[in-house]
Amino acid sequence: MIIALILTAAALLIGLRVRKNINNKPMEQTDTTVIAKRVLNLIILDESGSMRGLERASVDGVNETIQTIKGGYEQFPEQEQLLTFITFSSRGDSDYRTQFNLLPIPKVEEFNYANYFPNGGTPLYDTMGKALTDLEKEATDSDIVLVTIITDGYENASREYDQASIKALISRLDEKNWVFTYIGANQDAILEAGKIGIRNAMNYRSDERGTRDMWKKERKSRQYFMRVARSGVSMDRLKEDYFVDEEDK
């Protein structure tokens, strides 16, 4: 009887220290645990010439992702969701086009096909540098920031930022509540993401079907992320395994 009581007490103590998430993986409740009142979603989408022919799949994917974020907000309105959406290419007049800027998700309207016309090169580093530094000015220490980068080619047109400076910037932001994901085609996305310090990466095939499949997986991953972010996990755990297997979602 005494042994049984001791074992029961020990089990209760362990239960206070470790909690299981929806995948039954232990999540330490430490000082880094965050249940954010606000999530800043930053989506950076390649608009260079190599995206030509994929306009419809890309725009549809953006709009479906907007609906995913809206659905999460409608289910949990106490967690504010804001969206910044940027497209980029070296078109001459403007490399960097802000389609939505920190809009509360209920106010975000459908992205119009007329606002996406691929052309020019791929100034990825300049776009990331400007977008991240601008968003850092708006983010608070209690916010979670989810950065999604989608490109179908290599960096080839930046003038202000290089690989080293972007890696240093991401490394600094990674010490905060920032989560980075990189989705790439026509490259080894995992290798390219690693060069700038991004741990979550996914390859996709740059044709109509591959683009639609990519957006579908991104939305499922985002739904999972939003669900886990509300459960009070540690930030270290939240930064890992964004693109988890389908059966885990």
Where are these regions (language model features)?
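N-terminal Sec-pathway targeting helices
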Residues: 1-2
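Acidic, low-complexity intrinsically disordered regions
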Residues: 5-249
